[in-house]
Structure formats: structure tokens, C-alpha cells
């Protein structure tokens, strides 16, 4: 899975850059509204809301914006009705994409995504043709600097309920989605605090290099720039050095 861990690190850096714009707030507000609508406004009993509130804190979202978003989700305030939609797509090089969107107009979103895909060498896929490649998992990202003994950490994580551990920086601990909070808390008690989220992990990957690799990353960047798109997952495998070089070029 070379490239995927580096990708997690780059996406974290991208999120920090996005935070300088208002775009990340737009996405977080939608996520808070939907999480509160589905599981209630109390983060203690709503793991999904708890996870997105953590992201909101990291992005320095104003407290009143967070509270208004929760109230819109619970119905205490009138708000937009967002629908969760998953789009499946193909990128250059045979890479599969799993696109998570929150939209108040699915026809508009489908049209916009179709345009972005076709402009960047991709295409929408039939429902079900890509979904089987990805597994829904909980993921905890921990800075490698916090881990002095990887073997010891691995044993601790497995005892806590980890299913898989991906080395790199950050170290990524994969767990069953329903175990995410418990495993995160167990690791934190032992000094390994990290960021948690729900992710979609590919069962297999496709090696891409050169122009195909650049096209894949450019396409994902364009998709995630769309306000309706929350996150894009791909089963690409790009060497770390090449991935870093391409992202530096795209960011420049």
C-alpha cells in the first residue's frame, strides 16, 4: 500500500491549506447537520457527530457556527435538507474512485461530477461496479513521533481491537467502524492520541506512474474542490517520492 500512507499525510496537509479558505467550513457544516439529524445532537451518544466535531475543532470553526449546525440537524433551527449520496467512478489508469457527497440537489451534483470526471479523463461508473473494492473501516492516525517501539505499539493496538496497522507517518490503525471510539480511547490512555475517522479502505490497489499518476491526483483534487463532495477514496498505488513530487507540482 505504498503511497496510501503518504496520501493520508498529504491530505492532512491539504486540509490545513483548505482551512485558510472557507471551503472546509462549508463541508463541515453539512457533515455536522447530517450527523446530528441521523444520531441526535449529543456527541457523547453520537460517534459520527463526535468525530466531525473533532475535525471542526481542528479547523478552528467558530463555536456558534458549530452549535447552529447541530440545531439545524436536530430540527431546532430550520436548515437545508442534505442527502448522502455515494458516486462510483473510474479515473485514468484503471483506478477506482469512491466519492462521498452531501447534497441538497442530487441532479446538480451528478451533472457537476460528470463534468469534472470527463474533463480529467475519468467517468462515472455503474452502481455497484466499484463499491465492492472498498471496505468501510474506522481509522486512527497517530504521528510516528509518538511511537518509539513499533512492536510494542502493535501488540497494544491489537489488544485494543485493531484489525490492521499501516506503518509510515502517520501510522494508521484500522478497526471495525463500531470499535473506533473504544480503540481510540484505549490508545489515548497509553499516550497514543490520534485523529479518528471513518474511511473506505481498498481491498486491492492499482499501480500508476507518470502521467496517469498525475492525472489521478489532479482529478481527485478537482472532485474534492466541489462543495458537495466530502471525500474521495481511490485504490491507486503511487510510489511515495513520485506522489510527493506530483502534489508539490499541483499545489504550486
UniProtKB/Swiss-Prot annotation:
Listed Pfam families: TACO1_YebC_N, Transcrip_reg
Record-linked InterPro entries: Integrase-like_N, TACO1_YebC-like_2nd/3rd_dom, TACO1_YebC_N, Transcrip_reg_TACO1-like, Transcrip_reg_TACO1-like_dom3, YebC-like
MF (Gene Ontology): DNA binding
One Gene Ontology cellular component: cytosol
Subcellular location: Cytoplasm
UniProt keyword list: Cytoplasm, DNA-binding, Transcription, Transcription regulation
Superkingdom of source: Bacteria
Family membership noted in the UniProt record: Belongs to the TACO1 family.
Database matches in NCBIfam families: PRK00110.1, PRK12378.1, YebC/PmpR family DNA-binding transcriptional regulator
UniProt xrefs under HAMAP family: Transcrip_reg_TACO1 (MF_00693)
Record protein name field: Probable transcriptional regulatory protein Fnod_1106
